[in-house]
Amino acid sequence: MSTDDKQSRQSARKGWRRELREWVLSISMAVVIALLIQNYAFAQAEVRQSSMSGTLEEGHRLVEDKLSYVFSEPKRGDIVIIDGPESDVRLIKRLIALPGDTVDMREGLVYLNGVKLEESYAKGQTFPAGLNVPFTVEEGQVFVLGDNREHSLDSRQLGTISFESLEGKAVLRVWPLQKFGEIK
């Protein structure tokens, strides 16, 4: 075997190792980036309750924007993902009231600051379910309700939700495909 053949084989071996190292590094970087995005920017959420029925059904898959409330304040009407001490499970609810707002419920309807809410998305009537109304939301808290009002575990039972428990905002439905689109 000539010296050129030995050098050629060593070169091929080094090339193969370099190629493997580059692949491992590339795949590792992709996994790290995907995990960072999943944990800190956008995530997938699955609807597991019927409390948003009419708007969201069990089994729907959503894209959650976890940066929404880092750069801006929550807004009335947002569909929020809640993960905090208020509940043992992650919840998906509609944000109804912000700090300083007064919530009232009369004759199955919701009133916000004395004005009846127009809620085309709401299914069923809304009763206080043990909540003393009218009720004023404290600073750093929000009031949430499920759209399926008669079958929802929400602020009527749990109390207000801390800003810190708002994991993110549901922005896009990705499953089922025929319902793909922005969530309102």
What function would you assign to each model-found segment?
Residues 2-20, 25, 36, 40-46, ...:
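Soluble "head" domains of membrane/secretory-pathway proteins
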